[in-house]
Amino acid sequence: MTPSGPDWSAPAIGEVGEFALIGRITAGLGASGPVRLGVGDDCAVLRLAGDLAVSTDTMVEGVHFRRDWSGAHDVGRKAVAACVADAEAMGAVPVGLVLSLAAPASSPVEWVDDFSAGVRAECERAGVQLVGGDTTSAPLIVVTATVLADLGGLPPVTRAGARPGQVLAIAGLLGWAAAGVAVLGRGFRSPRAVVLAHRVPEPPYGEGRAAAEAGASALIDI
């Protein structure tokens, strides 16, 4: 997706109010599978088969993304992908995601709508449900995602289990996102593949669990 500037003539999030904004983000979300109670109450409730694995990830505008490099849809997808990848690296199955968004009150509602669409798209790709979150105002856009994952009766596969002489296996592409940052930083938009790797990373969902079930002694998200 090619980023475009926000439509500053559109309504701003400060004009629609927090509850209306939350309604736009969560419209149509329900509860299924391990999620017994999703958005709309003080807490979400999940039923798990094993131990709970939890990880959180924060993205700050100007540090982890730039709006002239990434569209709102891209930012939403990246927020989910970066967080869920950590659960995958423990051999856990992601089941729930809590997401908080802080943004300037002057930001167009259109940006939040596109961001939410990206979050939903990546949640669907990852097989995880958005179960809650928070919104507030801030000078810059800050997105924090927390993933809740089920180990399903298996022990967590930590970084500490690696031993000399073991086989090292890699799933996914190494260095492409960093190459994308370097390309964009020089004012270019191609090679497109590495630019997209920065804007919208695509973790190999399911590979972490498969590795854990196959007996991997160590896992890490890099």
Which residues make up each language-model segment?
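Helix-biased detector of long, well-ordered alpha-helical tracts
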Residues: 1-222
